[in-house]
Every structure is written in structure tokens, then in C-alpha cells.
Amino acid sequence: AYDAVVSSHCLEHVANPIKALLRWKQVLKSEGFMLLILPHKIGNFDHKRNDTTFEHIMSDFKNDVDENDDTHFKEFIDFFDLEKKPGKKISLEEHIEITKNNFKNREVHHHVFNKKLIYETLNYCDFEILDYLEEKEDLIIFCKNKI
């Protein structure tokens, strides 16, 4: 077992966040720590999207949604701000093609997190939140495994 898990800008790319968090929890020592960094939508290309609800995250978990899930592709295409994409600028057509090939490139943000969703999800997974920081581009959470 590990003392800590660090995840920076990963969980939003996972189709089933609760399943991932519970797996990460399994590799943590009892009372091990996790540093979780998620994108803050106001500072990136997700700013036009609605925040994901805990009910949606729970539904993905209960339905055992896997990484081939394309449920969010239309929203990711329709509300993606091409001007805020970091790195090389791309056309809408390129964005659509990248999104369709998500299983290979893992570009899609399946979910848009906010403080409420983070707290609900981590509480469900039995993590104790020790600190939370909101920056323009990042939501930073430091928590502890409650096992």
C-alpha cells in the first residue's frame, strides 16, 4: 500500500470517477493521503458547460460506466471553447475528430467538477477532506483515507 496518491488533471478524464476513486483508495494505506487537482472551469475550455451533479456521478457508478462511454461527447463538442484550448489551436472539425477518438487520446473532460460535487463524491468514497483551495485554473483538494 502507498502513503499517498497524487492526481493532477486526471479525474475529469475518467468516465466513472467513483470507481476510480475507490480503486485509488484500495492502494492507499489506512489513513493515507490523496492530493487531487481538478480543472476549475472558469479558467479553461469547460467554462460554458454545466457543472456535473452528484446524481449523475452516482448513476455512472451504479451503471458501471466504462471508459468507452461517449455520453458526454456532444456536450464536450458543443460547449468547448476552442479559444481556451491550451497548446496548438485547432479547428472545430479537428476537435470533433479528437473527441471521437477519445479512447485513444483521453482528451474529453467527461465531468465538470465544482466544490459541492467534489465534497459529495469524496464523502461518498469515505475520504476526509483536510483542505480545499480554489484557484482560477485549479481546484485543489487534500484528503485522507478514512479506513
Report each predicted region and the residues it spans:
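Short conserved loop adjoining the S-adenosyl-L-methionine
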Residues: 1
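A short His-aromatic
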Residues: 9-13
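Hydrophobic beta-strand segment of the Class I
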Residues: 5-6
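S-adenosyl-L-methionine-dependent methyltransferase catalytic module, highlighting the catalytic core
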Residues: 18-19, 23-26, 33-146
